[in-house]
Amino acid sequence: MAEAGKPRPLTAFAPPPPLWKHFTQDNLKRLEDIKKEASKGEDGKPRKKKWTPAELRALQLPPELRFLVPPEIPKSGQYSVFGELQSLSTTLPSLQEQGIEQLYPSTPTETDPDKPSQPSRPFNHAYYLLKISKSLLLNFLEFVGILSIAPEQFQSKVEDLRNLFINAHHLLNLYRPHQARESLIMMMEEQLNRSREEIQQMDKMHAEINGFLEQLKAQGIDIDSASKSREDVTAKRATGDQDANNANSSRLVWDILDGTD
């Protein structure tokens, strides 16, 4: 009881909800067993099934296992993160919608009520960012002067600094779509350059391989020609030897005939 009365220490993030204690290995195994039992077919064998949160909630789960069922994914509205409500809309709300004074001019906005309100964008955001940065330096010097003369009058200057910082951050957030688009263009250009370099390297390798094959082909023709020449010479020599043998045989026959006479 004494510990319950103690104030909770301030932290950057809120503590997890108490339901995390139900995420034990035993409870997870029990939930898997229930899912297998519920997914059995007519043959009594469990079937593979992708369970949705609604189907899991329809099962007869004990109270300690109901916390293991994930909630439905929010499709519209807001959701809570560490006790703070976050909007599902990706549209950046304008400073006027947030009740904050806007220190730079706005572009004309669309008046169509069917379309979601789009944030107003300055004509030259870089110029106004530089202007707000200089105003921040000036207001900070004034803030230091107030603290040195009348510290109790610091609140108004703190509000001015806060408003300047919010306007600067809003301008930066308005520039993020352009930054993302430019970053995507750079990434695509780098990928295109890499593809071109790879194609050039493949063309170079293709030319080298073709040259090597042509060289082998030329060497093969030379070898065939040399082999054919050697075969011709050998054939001629064989023919000459045969003719000489025939001549010797004929001469021997005539010599024998002459001796017989």
From Swiss-Prot:
Residues 31-54 are annotated as: Disordered. GO terms for biological process: regulation of transcription by RNA polymerase II. SUPFAM superfamilies: Mediator hinge subcomplex-like. It is found in: Nucleus. The keyword Cytoplasm does not apply. Residues 31-45 have a biased composition (Basic and acidic residues). The keyword Transcription regulation applies. Component of the Mediator complex. This is Mediator of RNA polymerase II transcription subunit 7. It comes from Aspergillus fumigatus (strain ATCC MYA-4609 / CBS 101355 / FGSC A1100 / Af293) (Neosartorya fumigata).
